[in-house]
From Swiss-Prot:
One of its GO terms (cellular component) is mitochondrion. One of its GO terms (molecular function) is ATPase inhibitor activity. PANTHER family: ATP SYNTHASE F1 SUBUNIT EPSILON. It is found in: Mitochondrion. It comes from Caenorhabditis elegans. This is ATPase inhibitor mai-1, mitochondrial. Residues 1-41 are annotated as: Disordered. Keywords: Coiled coil, Mitochondrion, Transit peptide. Thought to be a regulatory component of the ATP-synthesizing complex in the mitochondria.
Length: 88
């Protein structure tokens, strides 16, 4: 086994690696693989949560737009009534 892959021993990959990676060999590779899977899952969960938050924000913004449009229509109607009453 060469000393150039993930889990191939301490001092590789920039960090101390921890005791599992220090073991090297297949145990170290398995530990490195599990660690990478963990971080990929964490990243996926974060992205999923961000997506849900953005979708909720969009839904809320769309509702606010509808509410504002209703208020605008009411104001326009009142203006028409005022103009009608003044014969303008």
């Amino acid at each position: 086994m060469s000393g150039s892959g993930s889990g191939s021993g301490a001092g590789h990959g920039g960090g101390s690696g921890g005791s599992i990676r220090e073991a090297g060999g297949s145990l170290g590779m398995m530990g490195a693989t599990r660690e990478e899977e963990y971080f990929r899952r964490q990243q996926k969960d974060q992205l999923d949560n961000l997506k849900k938050k953005l979708e909720a924000d969009m839904t809320q913004s769309q509702q606010e737009i509808r509410d504002h449009e209703k208020v605008l229509e009411q104001h326009q109607q009142r203006l028409k009534e005022i103009e009608k009453g003044h014969g303008t």
